[in-house]
């Protein structure tokens, strides 16, 4: 089975072709990603209008390159998959509309993929893992712990009640004057800092649920930074190191609870799986190794290039769905918000969370 995947939910324009064998083994034939960092850097963050226009300008060429690198023509495709949300609606419209056009012209099945499901299923492409497994999904817009029990079968065990982890990293970078994109800059600065200098809180630590909260920690960083009369590069490194250490410790605590909840509902997970752009952070990857070791479970993390947004994960999610006969019509709609767990509700006492609703 050959599937073209298209990703345009944020600031990466991407397309890929994957091959899925009858036994479920996947192979990436091409995976082209064009980052829009340069376009958004002057503004210190992603500008939705600029992102959408860039997708319009870039996508046709990216798809053409992906097809040529894979060495196939459109007539050979068994399906076309596009991320239909959640994401910036302008970009989602561009990608889904393009996929519909290709599917219509070439009489090829269409799959409208949930971007979060694509992250959730990537470890099955890279490592061939069987269900069920416990997913830690962390990105600029989402932070969730999810039980993955099958294609289209997800139970959210925990979520953020305010900022996503990636969002918190970006906001801390911005308040400290670090360039965009902020996450890698904070990680880089933290490497030369003293993580013990600032005693930041460990949000939600010790709670019986598996939810996250980052807004208070972000405020604590701002307060400490404002107390420094003339902030130096070393001060920034120390602030970043202390912030990152707090995130790592809080994340480990939340994951320990999430794994306990998983075992209570589904038995022992086959693995703890990390996905999403934040999982490319080397310090977080190290912390996840510690959590998995203590939990006596396998840790699976796709290569960093497949943790951040890419077309291969969309193509693979499309292939997984096609293998089960799951396709979509031309009436498939783009969505700015799209729950991975359709039955999930907002954590008690918090109303609607910002990430995931």
UniProtKB/Swiss-Prot annotation:
Its cofactor is Fe(2+). Substrate binds at residues 137-141, 170, 183, 281. Fe cation binds at residues 115, 119, 309. One of its GO terms (biological process) is tRNA threonylcarbamoyladenosine modification. InterPro entries: ATPase_NBD, Gcp-like_dom, KAE1/TsaD, Peptidase_M22_CS, TsaD. GO terms for cellular component: cytoplasm. It catalyses: L-threonylcarbamoyladenylate + adenosine(37) in tRNA = N(6)-L-threonylcarbamoyladenosine(37) in tRNA + AMP + H(+). It is found in: Cytoplasm. Its EC number is 2.3.1.234. Binds 1 Fe(2+) ion per subunit. Pfam families: TsaD (PF00814). One of its GO terms (molecular function) is N(6)-L-threonylcarbamoyladenine synthase activity. Keywords: Acyltransferase, Cytoplasm, Iron, Metal-binding, Transferase, tRNA processing. Required for the formation of a threonylcarbamoyl group on adenosine at position 37 (t(6)A37) in tRNAs that read codons beginning with adenine. Is involved in the transfer of the threonylcarbamoyl moiety of threonylcarbamoyl-AMP (TC-AMP) to the N6 group of A37, together with TsaE and TsaB. TsaD likely plays a direct catalytic role in this reaction. Belongs to the KAE1 / TsaD family. This is tRNA N6-adenosine threonylcarbamoyltransferase. It comes from Bradyrhizobium diazoefficiens (strain JCM 10833 / BCRC 13528 / IAM 13628 / NBRC 14792 / USDA 110). The gene is tsaD.
């Amino acid at each position: 089975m050959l599937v073209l995947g298209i990703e345009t939910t944020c600031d990466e324009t991407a397309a890929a072709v994957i091959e899925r064998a009858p036994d479920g083994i996947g192979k990436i034939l091409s995976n082209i990603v064009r980052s829009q960092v340069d376009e958004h850097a002057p503004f210190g963050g992603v500008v939705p209008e600029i992102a959408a226009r860039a997708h319009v300008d870039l996508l046709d060429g990216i798809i053409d390159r992906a097809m040529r690198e894979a060495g196939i023509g459109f007539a050979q495709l068994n399906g076309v998959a596009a991320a239909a949300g959640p994401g910036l609606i302008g970009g989602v419209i561009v990608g889904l509309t393009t996929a519909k056009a290709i599917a219509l012209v070439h009489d090829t099945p269409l799959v409208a993929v949930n971007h979060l499901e694509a992250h959730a299923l990537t470890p099955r492409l890279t490592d061939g893992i069987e269900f069920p497994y416990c997913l830690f999904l962390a990105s600029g817009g989402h932070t969730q712990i999810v039980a993955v029990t099958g294609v289209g079968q997800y139970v959210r065990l925990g979520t953020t009640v305010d900022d996503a982890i990636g969002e918190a990293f970006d906001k801390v970078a911005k308040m400290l004057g670090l360039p965009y994109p902020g996450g890698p800059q904070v990680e880089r600065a933290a490497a030369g800092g003293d993580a013990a200098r600032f005693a930041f809180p460990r949000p939600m630590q010790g709670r019986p649920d598996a939810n996250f909260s980052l807004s208070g920690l972000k405020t604590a960083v701002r307060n400490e930074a404002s107390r420094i009369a003339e902030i130096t590069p070393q001060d920034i490194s120390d602030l970043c190191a202390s912030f990152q250490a707090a995130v790592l410790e809080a994340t480990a605590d939340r994951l320990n609870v999430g794994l306990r909840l998983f075992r209570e509902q589904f038995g022992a997970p086959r693995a703890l799986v990390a996905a999403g752009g934040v999982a490319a952070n080397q310090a977080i990857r190290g912390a996840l190794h510690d959590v998995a070791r203590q939990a006596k479970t396998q840790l699976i993390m796709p290569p960093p290039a497949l943790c951040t947004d890419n077309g291969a994960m969309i193509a693979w999610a499309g292939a997984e769905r096609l293998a089960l006969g799951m396709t979509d019509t031309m009436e498939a709609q783009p969505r700015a918000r799209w729950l991975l767990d359709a039955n999930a509700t907002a954590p008690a006492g918090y109303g609607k969370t910002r990430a995931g609703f």
